[in-house]
Design a protein with these regions (language model features):
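Acidic helix-start/capping segments at beta-turn-to-alpha-helix junctions
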Residues: 89-105
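Structured alpha-helical subdomains that flank or immediately precede key functional sites
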Residues: 1-67, 71-90, 110-120, 124-130, ...
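Predominantly the structural core of cysteine protease catalytic domains
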Residues: 2-4, 8, 75-79, 103-267
Length: 267
């Protein structure tokens, strides 16, 4: 994939998915078939509260004035998978998710990152906790000494999910999907019911869980003031439309049995 400049529509503090730099070949090579990952997950981990409300498990992040949406989304994915694997709550490093992905991408400066860079962090390099590499108030990719040797967490990732059946099967197994797409006014709704990919800047968020209506919960990184609680919903039809987008990438993640402590239920 040619590396042109990241999208001109990228706005620090709101967006940050540098889709012009995306490497689809690496996403395919590092990812596994979704059905295989699902089987391994079901065979390895016990079932905790798989109907948990996302806001009861996660802390909604605010990326502030950085184009770090991908790193914020990846950190949420790790928190979800950690909960599913152990029944416990933990916060993972947004800085590691963003700055290490940028390093892999070859992007310098606060210009966003790619899902392929994030996938490399999740499956190859490893992630650390937020307490090991705290999120700074302004762009600062320098890794602190406290993060040295702390990248002990990894995940399994799928190849890009390209059809609605695969997406729903993943979500209905209570597993998260990191998404990257063009974000525009059709996305700034309580329920996204008429998504269009024709314009907008690159943004990355997390799909996790479905409401009784069948709508999919989307976890954003613009703080709790956005939409009143930091999350909103997408209809299945809007997700279908998103999958047709030129710049859309959906990656399913699951716990890696070799990278988490022995499962322990919440007491």
């Amino acid at each position: 994939v040619s590396k042109s400049k990241p999208t001109k529509d990228l706005t620090p503090g709101r967006l940050g998915y540098a889709f012009d730099w995306e490497r689809l070949d690496e996403l395919e090579e590092r990812g596994s078939d979704a059905e295989l990952v699902l089987k391994q997950y079901r065979d390895t981990f016990p079932k905790f509260d798989t109907t948990a409300d996302p806001l009861g498990v996660l802390k909604v992040f605010d990326q502030g004035q950085q184009g770090s949406c991908q790193g914020n989304a990846l950190a949420q994915v790790f928190s979800i998978c950690y909960f599913l694997a152990t029944g416990r709550h933990e916060t993972f490093s947004r800085s590691a998710g963003y700055y290490l992905a940028q390093k892999r991408d070859g992007i310098s400066g606060d210009k966003g990152s790619t899902l392929s860079g994030g996938q490399w962090v999740a499956t190859q390099h490893g992630m650390c906790l937020e307490s090991d590499w705290p999120y700074p108030s302004r762009y600062n990719p320098a890794m602190p000494p406290s993060a040295e040797g702390k990248f002990n967490f990894k995940l399994k990732a799928t190849k890009p999910l390209k059809d609605i059946d695969s997406v729903l099967a993943w979500l209905d197994s209570s597993l998260p999907i990191q998404i990257g797409l063009t974000w525009n006014g059709t996305c700034d709704q309580e329920v996204v019911s008429n998504y269009s990919s024709r314009s907008g800047g690159g943004h990355s968020t997390v799909f996790w869980q479905r409401r009784a209506s069948g709508n999919i919960v989307n976890i954003n990184s613009w703080g709790t003031r956005w939409n009143g609680d930091g999350v909103h919903e997408w209809t299945v039809d809007s997700v279908k439309e998103a999958l047709r987008g030129r710049w859309t990438v959906f990656i399913g993640y699951a716990p890696d049995g070799m990278s988490f402590p022995a499962p322990k239920a919440i007491s």
